[in-house]
Amino acid sequence: MCHALVIEDDYLVADYIAALAEFSGATSTAIASTQEEALKSAKAKRPAVILCDVRLDKGCGPSAIGEILACLGAIPVLYITGIPEECPASHRAHSVLPKPFSRDAFVSAFRKHAGIG
């Protein structure tokens, strides 16, 4: 089972990322548009992988990741952002997929982080 949590405040982008995650092998997805929703969603169902934007309308992607990992332990994170340089140095151990991205680049990065074939 591979549950993916998408943290993205642009609904169309979030929906596209969730669809690509399912195409790439995720068995389920959840979408959170705020830092608070992300933490609630992760606590409700522990994700196998997190796909996260850096900037959110309410909150901050890296802050949401920090809270989730502090609560749930290690989870692979793939930042998907148009501004990779804004990803904090403390989070650069996680991978970054710059927007815009190709379907093939997403599939490859997702499968690597999710541990899928």
Locate predicted features.
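Two-component/phosphorelay signaling modules centered on CheY-like receiver
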Residues: 10-30
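Acidic, metal-coordinating helix/loop segments flanking the phosphotransfer/catalytic sites
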Residues: 31-49
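Short amphipathic alpha-helix used as the core "switch/output" element in two-component signaling
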Residues: 62-74
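Acidic catalytic/metal-coordinating carboxylates
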Residues: 34, 60-63
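Acidic di-acidic motifs
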Residues: 8-9, 99
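Hydrophobic/aromatic residues positioned on beta-strands within the core alpha/beta folds
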Residues: 80-81
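C-terminal output helix
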Residues: 101-114
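Active-site residues of response regulator receiver
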Residues: 53-54
